[in-house]
UniProtKB/Swiss-Prot annotation:
Localization annotation: Cytoplasm; Nucleus, Nucleolus
Protein name: Eukaryotic translation initiation factor 6
Similarity comment: family membership: Belongs to the eIF-6 family.
Entry's Gene Ontology BP terms: cytosolic ribosome assembly; ribosomal large subunit biogenesis
Top-level division of the source organism's lineage: Eukaryota
Length: 239
């Protein structure tokens, strides 16, 4: 199931949140429509409030999966310690000396593979492979190097910006080995990483997301429960 949410009247919930299969990090504050994220995920995984370098744009600055969390060098010692103490013990939390500090914009990953900005530092690439335990591939999405902004990847599926060419889709599909689709959120926005957060069992999209967009998100990431799938199958047969 995927739900709509917003952060202080912003539909760009992915800017302020980081969701993995092992933990969720949210920005301080937010209205009741943002707190729904914590309500949904906290029974299964820890949900932690945090800032990075005093900023609330967690999703843009950090990248992680069930094995680790990478933070930019703007993250101060107190924030680093807070996250290390709050996340599960087997999640490695590490600061990265990368000149492109918006790691969340430059990296898209699941628990096995990472797509990264083609110009990311070689040392950073090695840290990504080591801490997150993934294979790393330098790639663009729709000709844009900000792969974390223009794609969202889980272990079950991936969505790419709509201007992604067929060749790019085939290349990325071969790399990821999961079903993928080109799509939008928030009523036609191609800023997928900004507009949604997804793991293997739940997802959240910006409040402006249409019913059609929401349905595609639920389908590609396999977020529908069995009853929903059966109902959809019946409706398809009735057409």
């Amino acid at each position: 199931m995927a739900l709509r949410a917003e952060y202080e009247n912003s539909a760009d919930i992915g800017v302020f949140t980081k969701l993995t299969n092992k933990y969720c990090i949210t920005a301080p504050g937010g209205s009741s429509s943002y707190k729904i994220i914590e309500q949904e995920v906290s029974p299964k995984i820890p949900c932690v409030e945090a800032t990075i370098g005093g900023l609330r744009i967690i999703g843009r600055l950090a990248v992680g999966n069930r094995k680790g969390l990478l933070l930019p060098n703007t993250c101060n010692d107190q924030e680093l310690l807070h996250l290390r103490n709050s996340l599960p013990d087997d999640v490695v939390v590490q600061r990265v000396e990368e000149r492109m500090s918006a790691l969340g914009n430059c990296i898209a990953c699941n628990d096995y593979v990472a797509l990264v900005h083609p110009e990311i530092d070689r040392e950073t690439e090695e840290i990504i492979a080591d801490v997150l335990g993934v294979e790393v591939f330098r790639h663009a999405v729709g000709g844009n190097p900000l792969v974390g902004t223009y794609s969202v990847i889980t272990n079950k599926g991936a969505m790419l910006a709509p201007n992604t060419t067929q060749q790019e889709q085939e290349e990325i599909g071969t790399i990821l080995q999961v079903p993928l689709v080109a799509g939008t959120v928030n009523r036609g926005s191609n800023l997928l990483g900004s507009g949604m957060i997804v793991n293997d069992w739940c997802g959240f999209v910006g409040m402006d997301t249409t019913a059609t967009e929401l349905s595609i998100v639920e389908g590609i990431y396999k977020l529908r429960n069995e009853t929903d799938v059966q109902f959809a199958s019946v409706m398809e047969l009735m057409k």
